[in-house]
Amino acid sequence: MKTILSLFSFIFLLVSCEDVIEIDLDSVEPKLVIEGCINDLDDPCTIKLSKTGDYFEPGIYPIVSDALVTITDENGIETEFEESEPGTYTSESLEVEELGSYTLHIQSEGEDYMAEGVVPHKVFIDSLSYDIPPLFYEFEEGYMLTCYLQDPAEYRNYYRLIVYKKGEPKSSDGMMYIFNDDFMNGNMIFMSWESDPLFPQDTVVVELQTLDKSTYDYYFTLNSLAGGMFGASNPSNPETNLSNDALGYFGAYTVSRDTIVILPN
């Protein structure tokens, strides 16, 4: 029988920084910020472009219009994106295949930006369960949700878990649950959702994303920078796979979803 391993110690938390630090800074040249992922869902693929804000104008992030945005697959088939709204570029015709390699190319204001993403092997949710939490747990009422998945031994895998209730991501404490299969390769893995309790008649959708490494690395760096975790004593820009000093990320992932209704015992 394969070992079932818990991921409690492999949960990375995404927290917000609340302290305001006043520093004298010179105005810097804005950089392009690229946000986009491809996945195996039938939804339109979206790439968002903006620029970093000026320190002296906090909260203002200019959108980037009139860019040329394309994605090319490993067979040389190019898909051009249309600007559906200012700064947002979409395609409904891009066909994404598992284990396929895709190259993003952006031309904006005389500059070229590129990134590559490889769609990972899809890992499915095995099952979902819920139970009364142990004594002295973080919450004393309601039920604790647990997701099980069988990690494939032939791949290095990176995951993100999202829980939805009434169509909205459910995470009252702002946690982002990402983990990999280090020390758990080829095993049945279970993750308990410790962020929020669930109650009778709740209908919960659980989404398991299998991430490519660049997306995982980006999320991991965001976690460490936001929370001051993992030895990040010298804050810097999050790790990215984008060229030409752009910020943000271009990633790929596959999706498995399952639904569970919480019934009273």
Regions found by a protein language model. Give the residues of each.
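C-terminal motif of bacterial Sec signal peptides marking the signal peptidase cleavage site
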Residues: 14-16
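N-terminal hydrophobic targeting signals that begin at the initiator methionine
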Residues: 1-2, 18
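A sequence/structural signal for flexible, mid-protein segments enriched
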Residues: 18-265
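Sec-dependent signal peptide recognition
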Residues: 2-10
